[in-house]
């Protein structure tokens, strides 16, 4: 059985992130935590809908296997 390596997301902690999820869903919010499977806790999360609207989700957990693309809203050094 292979050992799971934790994702290197520490530099993104407490930063605002844009996430594209499977099913063509988009969420943005502040990364507050993660685990070795890249499940993430996102605070002040907002889901952007296809019709241009948005839904405030508050604090939510996003499963790592549903993340397609993840990028910070501002440059990280």
From Swiss-Prot:
Pfam families: LSM. Residues 4-76 form the Sm domain. It comes from the Eukaryota. GO terms for molecular function: RNA binding. The keyword RNA-binding applies. GO terms for cellular component: catalytic step 2 spliceosome; cytosol; P granule; precatalytic spliceosome; SMN-Sm protein complex; spliceosomal tri-snRNP complex; U1 snRNP; U12-type spliceosomal complex. SMART domains: Sm (SM00651). Keywords: Cytoplasm, mRNA processing, mRNA splicing, Nucleus, Ribonucleoprotein, RNA-binding, Spliceosome. Plays a role in pre-mRNA splicing as a core component of the spliceosomal U1, U2, U4 and U5 small nuclear ribonucleoproteins (snRNPs), the building blocks of the spliceosome. Belongs to the snRNP Sm proteins family. This is Probable small nuclear ribonucleoprotein G.
